[in-house]
C-alpha cells in the first residue's frame, strides 16, 4: 500500500463529495461557522507551505461541521500585484532560472511557458492548477463562491470599499520615501521582494564638508559626533560623481540611488584616489580636515563618504591608522563603562580588524553611547567663538538623544544639513532581481494606518479577537502599534483601478482586507457589474437604504437584494481567519483596520489563527528563494492523507517545521495498520462475549474522546492527532493482546469512532474505513462525544495500571539496554495505597507537606518521595485511584499471560513487598511504592 493507494482512495471520495455537493453551504437555522484562508498569488503552484495553512483550516472546518455547525469554507485567487507581473516579465527577459523551474520542477511545456509572458495567461494557468491541487488535497470548499481579484464584480466591491475609506479620511495623498524597484518602476512591499522581506526606510543625516568647488555630503546616523570629526573618508577604489549646482561629491552607486530621491545632474566623474588629499572644513568646528581613502568605506551606503570620528568609531580609527602614523582622537561623548577614547578601546577589546567581526562590538558601543552617553562640556572649546554660547546652552552636558536633535538644528541654521533615505535592512532585491532603492514619490495615494485614532481603535479591537496561538497576540499588537501609512496603489499590473484615479491600480495588500465579505454573495452575483453600485453594496453589506429604492436604481429585484442581504447577515462576521506567520506584519493588521472602518466592531473577525512556516533544508521556503517544494510533488510521492497528517503533527501551530520524509512514512504505516485492522475485522466471525478487556476498551476510548475533543477545541492539533494516530492504535493493539477472540461489536465500534476522530485530518481513508461498515459520509456524521461510551472505572484502573507497568518495564529495559527474559515485581501493601489516596486528595486541595503529614501520620521525607514519584503516573491513574479500589498483586497475577506476551519474557514472579519470605533481589523489595512497583529485570 503506497502513495498510489492513498491517492486512488482520495480521488474516489473527492468525486463522491463533489457529485453530492457535500460542502456547499447555504443559510439555515443551524449555528454557522465561516472560515477562510489567505488566498494565494497565482504565479506558481501551491507548495507545502500553503498546504500547512490550508490543511489546518480544513481540519477546523471539518471538525466544526462534524460538531453540528453549518460551515462555509470558500476559496479565491489573488491576481493583483507584482508577484505575477515580475514572474511574467522575468520570462519575457529570458530568465533561465525561472524558465528552468517552470519546465523541470513544475513540469510545464516550453510552449506553455512562453505564453506566460502575458501575466493574465500566467495567472489563469496557475489559478486552474491551484484549484485542482486544492481539490486533490481534499479541502472541503464550497467552490460555487470562487472568484479572482480581477473579476469585474469584485472590482465594484473594492471600489466601494475605497470610496468608503476616502470618505472617512483614511486615504490621502502625500509625498513620501518608499522602497522602490527601479526596474519595475513601482513601490514594493514584502510580497514583492526575494525572501519576502519588508523594506525598512531609514532617514540619514547628511553633513556637508565644503572645500574649493567640492562639497562632501557625509551621511551619518550620529550627527552629534560631528564635533569630533577630523577627516573625511572615501573609498579610493570607487568612482565618484561631481553634481552640478550643489558641487556634491557622490559615489557612482550613491548617485544612482539618490537620483530616485532628488534632482541630480552629473557634472563629471572622478576616481576616488584622485580626491585623496583635498582639504574641506568641518562645518561645526570650522577647522580644515583632509580627505583620506579607506577600504572600510562602502561606496554603496549613504553618499559614499563619511566623516571620520576616530574617538567613537572603531572603523574610522582603523581606517585612519592605516594612512597616518599618528591618529588624532577628539572625544565628544562621556559614557559610563568606557574611557575617553571608546573607538580604539573597542578595537583593542575585539582583537580583530575584520568589519564583520567588529559589527556586534560597534552596535553595542552605539547603543551604549545613545542611551547612557552625555556630551562632554569641553566640546565648547572645539567651536568658533560665535557658536560657543549656543553649544554650551543646548548641547554640552546634554544626553545624546537631546544633543542629537540640537546638533541637527544647529547644522540646519548653518545651511550644512540635509537628509537622505536608505534601506536600513538592505540589500533587498525585487523578485525581478533589481536591488530595491528608496524613492521619494509625490502625490502617492496612501491608506493612513498611522492615523492615531484609527490605530488606537484597532489596538483596542484586537482585545475582542481570539488569537491562536495566544503568544502571537504580542506580535500582532506590535505590528499595529508600529504601523505607518502605506502606499495603496501602483502604476502597473493586474488589479482594480483606483476609482478616482484610473491611472493607478490598487495593490495586492489593499484589495485583500475585507474580501471575505465578498464570499458571502459571490455565487449569486450574475448581474451586469455596472449595476453593483455603491447603493447596492450599502444595502447588501451594511443594511443601509430601502430595498425598493435600491431595486429601482440597480434594476435588481427586491427579492434578490433581500436574499443577498440575508446571505451576508447570516455568514458574517468571519469566525476564523487562517494565515501564515509572515502576514502578521501586514495583511492581518490591515484586516482588522479595514473591518473596523467599513463594518464597525460588531463584525470584526472572531478568531485569527496563525501558523509557522514550512522549511526546506532548514531554510524558510519562498518562491523568491527558488526552494519551493510543490504540493503536487509531495502528494504524488506520499499520498494525500499522509501529507495532511504529517504537516499537522510535525510541530506546534506557531513553530516552523521541516517537511520530514520519516514523519510522512511513519504516518503512512500507521494509517495502513488501521485500514488493515478494519478490513480484517470485517472478515471475523461475530463474537459478542464481554469481559474486563471490553469494558476497559470502551471506557478508555471515552477518556480519549474527551481529551481529543478538548484539544480540537483549543486547536492543539498536533497533540490531538498524535493521540488519534498513535495512542489510539496502541489501545486497540493492547486490547487484541488481552483477548484470544475479540468482541467484534466492540472492536467495530472502536474503529468507527476512530474513523470519525481521524476524519478532519485524514478524510479520505476515514471514508474508506467508515464504508466498510456503514453508509453515508463520515464527513457528515457527528464527531464522537464521550457520552457515547459508558465508563467502567474499575476496569480502567486495573488495565491502565497494567499498561503503566508495561511502560515502566520498557523504560528500565531501555536504560539497561537489555531485553529481559525474566521479571521480578514487588508491589506495595494496601495500607500504603490508602496513604497515596489521602495524599492525592490533599494535593487536589492544595495542602502542603506538613498538612499531608498530619493527615496521614507519615514522615514528610517519605511523603516528599511519594509525591515526586507519583508525578510519573498517568493522569488517569492519579484520578481514578482516589475513587476506585485496586489490588495491585491480584491485578498483576490476573493479567500475567497478557504481560508475558506484551513484554516478550519467559517468566514473571510477583511478590508483596511486606511478605517476609519474599526474596529481596537487588534491594528492590523496599523500593515499592503504591502504583509504582519495584521491578527487577533478569
Swiss-Prot record:
Got a GO cellular component term for this one? cytoplasm
EC number(s) of the enzyme? 6.1.1.4
- InterPro entries recorded for this chain? aa-tRNA-synth_Ia (IPR002300), Leu-tRNA-lgase_arc (IPR020791), Leu-tRNA-synth_Ia_arc/euk (IPR004493), M/V/L/I-tRNA-synth_anticd-bd (IPR013155), Rossmann-like_a/b/a_fold (IPR014729), tRNAsynth_Ia_anticodon-bd (IPR009080), Val/Leu/Ile-tRNA-synth_edit (IPR009008)
Q: Where is this motif: 'HIGH' region?
A: 40-50
GO biological process: one example:
leucyl-tRNA aminoacylation
Which cysteines share a disulfide bond? none
Binding-site residues for ATP, renumbered to this chain? 623
Tell me one Pfam family matched here: Anticodon_1
**Coiled-coil features, chain-numbered ranges:** none
> Catalyses which reaction?
tRNA(Leu) + L-leucine + ATP = L-leucyl-tRNA(Leu) + AMP + diphosphate
Q: Name one GO molecular function term.
A: leucine-tRNA ligase activity
Alphabetically sorted, this entry's keywords are: Aminoacyl-tRNA synthetase, ATP-binding, Cytoplasm, Ligase, Nucleotide-binding, Protein biosynthesis
Record bears the keyword Lipid biosynthesis: no
Q: Motif 'KMSKS' region, which positions?
A: 620-624
Recorded family membership = Belongs to the class-I aminoacyl-tRNA synthetase family.
Q: Which PANTHER family match?
A: LEUCINE--TRNA LIGASE, CYTOPLASMIC (PTHR45794:SF1), LEUCYL-TRNA SYNTHETASE (PTHR45794)
Q: What is the protein's given name?
A: Leucine--tRNA ligase 1
Organism equals Metallosphaera sedula (strain ATCC 51363 / DSM 5348 / JCM 9185 / NBRC 15509 / TH2)
Name of the coding gene? leuS1
Amino acid at each position: 500500500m503506497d502513495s498510489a493507494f492513498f491517492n486512488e482512495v482520495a480521488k474516489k471520495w473527492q468525486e463522491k463529495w463533489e457529485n453530492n455537493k457535500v460542502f456547499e453551504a447555504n443559510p439555515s437555522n443551524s449555528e454557522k461557522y465561516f472560515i477562510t484562508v489567505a488566498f494565494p498569488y497565482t504565479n506558481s503552484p501551491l507548495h507545502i507551505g500553503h498546504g500547512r495553512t490550508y490543511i489546518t483550516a480544513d481540519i477546523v472546518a471539518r471538525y466544526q461541521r462534524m460538531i453540528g455547525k453549518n460551515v462555509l469554507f470558500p476559496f479565491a485567487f489573488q491576481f493583483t500585484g507584482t508577484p505575477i507581473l515580475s514572474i511574467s516579465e522575468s520570462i519575457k527577459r529570458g530568465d533561465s532560472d525561472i524558465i528552468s523551474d517552470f519546465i523541470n520542477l513544475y513540469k510545464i511545456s516550453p510552449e506553455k511557458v512562453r505564453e506566460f509572458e502575458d501575466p493574465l495567461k500566467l495567472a489563469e494557468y496557475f489559478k486552474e492548477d491551484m484549484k485542482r491541487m486544492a481539490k486533490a488535497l481534499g479541502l472541503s470548499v464550497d467552490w460555487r463562491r470562487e472568484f479572482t481579484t480581477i473579476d469585474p464584480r469584485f472590482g465594484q466591491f473594492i471600489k466601494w470599499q475605497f470610496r468608503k475609506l476616502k470618505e472617512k479620511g483614511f486615504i490621502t495623498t502625500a509625498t513620501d520615501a518608499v522602497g522602490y524597484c527601479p526596474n519595475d518602476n513601482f513601490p514594493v512591499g514584502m510580497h514583492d521582494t526575494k525572501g519576502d522581506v519588508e523594506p525598512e526606510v531609514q532617514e540619514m543625516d547628511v553633513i556637508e564638508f565644503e572645500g574649493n568647488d567640492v562639497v562632501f555630503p557625509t551621511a551619518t546616523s550620529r550627527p552629534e559626533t560631528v564635533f569630533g570629526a577630523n577627516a573625511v573618508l572615501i573609498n579610493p577604489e570607487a568612482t565618484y560623481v561631481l553634481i552640478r549646482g550643489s558641487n556634491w561629491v557622490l559615489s557612482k552607486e550613491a548617485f544612482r540611488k539618490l537620483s530616485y530621491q532628488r534632482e541630480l545632474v552629473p557634472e563629471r566623474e572622478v576616481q576616488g584616489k584622485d580626491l585623496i588629499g583635498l582639504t574641506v572644513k568641518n562645518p561645526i568646528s570650522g577647522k580644515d580636515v583632509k580627505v583620506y581613502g579607506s577600504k572600510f568605506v562602502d561606496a554603496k551606503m549613504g553618499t559614499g563618504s563619511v566623516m571620520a570620528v576616530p574617538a567613537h568609531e572603531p572603523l574610522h580609527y582603523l581606517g585612519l591608522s592605516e594612512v597616518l602614523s599618528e591618529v588624532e582622537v577628539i572625544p565628544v561623548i562621556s559614557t559610563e563603562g568606557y574611557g575617553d577614547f571608546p573607538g580604539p578601546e573597542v578595537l583593542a577589546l575585539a582583537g580583530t580588524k575584520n568589519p564583520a567581526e567588529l559589527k556586534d562590538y560597534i552596535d553595542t558601543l552605539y547603543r551604549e553611547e545613545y542611551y547612557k552617553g552625555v556630551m562632554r562640556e569641553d566640546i565648547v572649546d572645539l567651536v568658533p567663538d560665535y557658536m560657543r554660547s549656543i553649544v554650551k546652552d543646548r548641547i554640552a552636558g546634554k544626553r545624546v538623544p537631546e544633543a542629537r536633535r540640537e546638533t541637527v538644528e544647529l547644522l540646519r541654521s548653518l545651511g550644512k544639513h540635509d537628509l537622505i533615505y536608505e534601506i536600513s535592512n538592505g540589500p533587498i532585491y525585487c523578485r525581478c532581481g533589481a536591488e530595491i532603492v528608496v524613492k521619494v514619490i509625490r502625490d502617492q495615494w496612501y491608506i493612513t494606518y498611522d492615523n492615531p485614532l484609527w490605530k488606537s481603535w484597532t489596538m483596542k479591537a484586537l482585545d475582542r479577537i481570539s488569537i491562536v496561538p495566544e503568544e502571537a497576540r504580542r506580535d500582532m499588537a506590535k505590528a499595529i502599534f508600529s504601523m505607518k501609512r502605506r502606499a495603496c496603489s501602483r502604476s502597473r499590473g493586474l488589479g482594480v483601478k483606483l476609482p478616482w484615479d484610473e491611472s493607478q491600480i490598487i495593490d495586492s495588500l489593499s484589495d485583500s482586507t475585507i474580501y471575505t465579505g465578498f464570499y458571502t454573495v459571490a455565487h449569486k452575483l450574475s448581474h451586469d457589474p455596472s449595476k453593483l453600485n455603491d447603493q447596492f453594496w450599502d444595502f447588501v453589506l451594511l443594511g443601509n437604504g430601502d430595498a425598493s429604492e435600491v431595486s429601482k436604481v440597480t434594476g435588481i429585484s427586491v427579492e434578490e437584494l433581500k436574499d443577498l442581504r440575508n446571505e451576508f447577515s447570516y455568514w458574517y462576521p468571519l469566525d476564523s481567519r487562517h494565515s501564515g506567520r509572515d502576514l502578521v506584519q501586514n495583511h492581518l493588521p490591515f484586516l482588522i483596520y479595514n473591518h473596523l472602518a467599513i463594518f464597525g466592531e460588531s463584525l470584526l473577525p472572531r478568531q485569527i489563527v496563525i501558523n509557522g512556516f514550512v522549511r526546506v533544508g532548514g531554510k524558510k521556503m519562498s518562491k523568491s528563494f527558488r526552494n519551493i517544494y510543490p504540493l503536487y510533488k509531495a502528494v504524488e510521492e506520499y499520498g494525500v492523507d499522509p501529507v495532511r497528517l504529517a504537516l499537522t503533527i510535525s510541530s506546534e501551530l506557531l513553530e516552523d517545521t521541516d517537511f520530514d520524509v520519516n514523519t510522512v512514512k511513519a504516518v503512512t504505516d500507521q494509517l495502513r495498520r488501521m485500514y488493515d485492522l478494519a478490513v480484517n475485522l470485517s472478515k471475523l466471525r461475530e463474537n459478542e462475549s464481554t469481559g474486563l478487556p471490553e469494558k476497559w476498551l470502551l471506557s478508555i476510548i471515552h477518556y480519549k474522546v474527551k481529551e481529543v475533543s478538548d484539544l480540537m477545541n483549543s486547536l492543539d492539533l498536533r497533540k490531538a492527532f498524535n493521540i488519534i494516530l498513535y495512542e489510539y492504535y496502541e489501545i486497540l493493539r493492547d486490547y487484541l493482546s488481552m483477548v484470544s477472540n475479540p468482541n467484534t461489536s466492540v472492536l467495530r465500534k472502536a474503529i468507527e469512532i476512530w474513523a470519525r476522530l481521524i476524519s478532519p485530518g485524514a478524510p479520505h481513508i476515514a471514508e474508506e474505513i467508515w464504508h466498510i461498515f456503514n453508509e453515508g459520509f463520515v464527513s457528515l456524521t457527528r464527531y464522537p462525544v464521550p457520552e457515547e461510551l459508558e465508563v467502567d472505572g474499575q476496569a480502567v484502573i486495573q488495565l491502565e495500571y497494567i499498561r503503566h507497568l508495561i511502560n515502566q518495564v520498557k523504560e528500565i529495559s531501555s536504560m539497561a539496554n537489555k531485553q529481559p527474559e525474566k521479571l521480578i515485581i514487588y508491589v506495595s501493601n494496601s495500607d500504603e495505597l490508602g496513604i497515596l489516596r489521602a495524599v492525592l486528595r490533599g494535593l487536589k486541595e492544595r495542602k502542603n507537606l506538613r498538612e499531608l503529614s498530619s493527615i496521614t501520620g507519615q514522615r514528610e521525607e517519605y511523603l516528599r518521595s511519594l509525591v515526586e514519584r507519583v508525578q510519573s503516573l498517568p493522569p488517569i491513574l492519579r484520578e481514578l485511584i482516589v475513587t476506585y479500589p485496586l489490588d495491585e498483586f491480584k491485578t498483576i497475577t490476573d493479567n500475567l499471560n497478557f504481560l508475558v506476551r506484551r513484554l516478550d519474557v519467559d517468566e514473571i514472579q510477583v511478590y508483596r513487598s511486606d511478605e517476609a519470605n519474599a526474596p529481596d533481589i537487588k534491594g528492590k523489595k523496599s523500593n515499592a511504592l503504591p502504583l509504582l512497583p519495584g521491578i527487577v529485570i533478569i
